[in-house]
């Protein structure tokens, strides 16, 4: 490994914190994850372009996520494009939306397609990514029992409990 944190010439640098999105890709396909995150091989497709377009609104930072100790039970939270990290967990994630009220918060992750007709209404990689977002919120002191996957094409919100 080189002194600048890279594996070798032509490879992507090793991140200090593991992005939740990288874990999503690994759960979906370990080989594809390696090609994308280690080899740096990635090409846009019509699906990824659609996904980028679907995220335009949520990628615009709006609203503020108050520190957990300042989030009062009667305060409504609606904050977009929030980045959270934890050295203890070794994770970093960009949360599309964090909603909250009555002292609890809930991450909402946007997906471009329609809700899949699978048990639980969500694919496993998305479930894992959302669980990591919940863990990060808890690590920052928030009360969080799960999240929501919002499917843009079908305009459906699917709750995902996290123990």
Language model region names:
Residues 1-107, 114-118, 128:
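Metal-dependent nuclease catalytic cores that hydrolyze phosphodiester bonds in DNA/RNA
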Residues 2-8, 88, 120-121, 136-163:
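Metal-dependent nuclease catalytic regions and adjoining charged, substrate-binding loops involved
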Residues 110-114, 151-153:
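A short beta-strand motif that forms part of the nucleic acid-binding face
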Residues 123-127:
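Short, conserved loop/turn and helix-capping segments at secondary-structure boundaries
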Residues 128-135:
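Short amphipathic alpha-helical face segments that pack within enzyme cores
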């Amino acid at each position: 490994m080189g002194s600048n944190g890279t594996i070798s010439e032509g490879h992507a640098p090793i991140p200090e914190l593991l992005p939740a999105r990288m874990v999503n890709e690994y759960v979906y396909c370990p080989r594809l994850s390696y090609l994308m995150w280690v080899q740096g091989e990635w090409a846009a497709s019509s699906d990824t372009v659609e996904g980028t377009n679907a995220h335009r609104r949520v990628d615009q930072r709006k609203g503020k996520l108050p520190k957990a100790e300042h989030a009062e039970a009667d305060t409504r939270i609606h904050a977009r494009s929030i980045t959270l990290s934890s050295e203890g967990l070794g994770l970093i994630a960009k949360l599309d939306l964090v909603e909250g009220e009555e002292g609890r918060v809930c991450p909402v992750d946007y997906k471009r397609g329609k809700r899949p007709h699978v048990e639980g209404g969500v694919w496993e990689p998305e479930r894992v990514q959302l669980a990591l977002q919940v863990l990060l919120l808890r690590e920052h002191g928030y009360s969080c029992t799960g999240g929501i996957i919002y499917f843009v094409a079908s305009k459906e919100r699917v709750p995902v409990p996290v123990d």
